[in-house]
Amino acid sequence: MQIWVDADACPKVVKEVLFRAATRTGIQLTLVANHYIPVPSAANIRSMQVEAGFDVADDEIVKRSEAGDLVISADIPLAAELIEKKVQVLNPRGELYTEATIKARLNIRDFMDTMRASGIQTGGPAPLSQTERREFANQLDRILAKAKI
């Protein structure tokens, strides 16, 4: 198992949790983004810069990830594609997407896109709360413990 991060929009606090977990466990952690992302100096932590462009980082994660890996992303279509590959997907708020929940998430996303396209202001997501940060860290620990890392 290794961890892939859709790092273009990943909150700094989530990256810090991931850096600590990778340092503690030795698991391979790769942050994928279309710009340089600084990472701690460690053999198991790296940053991968891809070309700028729509979904280029997402496509790289789909290409490189394997069944059993963990991807950190809030991107619902990316999560749906990864779940089909049997890759686990955890969003930065601590929600683990599953086959059972991803279809509903896609429907909500599509509905919100339709509302925005019709001119209705929907706003963006709220900043991460302390509870969500804690839930992310706890869920990550559960996943790593289950994988015995």
Swiss-Prot record:
Pfam families: DUF188. Transmembrane segments: none annotated. InterPro entries: UPF0178. CDD domains: PIN_YqxD-like. Belongs to the UPF0178 family. This is UPF0178 protein VF_0601. The lineage of its organism: Bacteria, Pseudomonadati, Pseudomonadota, Gammaproteobacteria, Vibrionales.
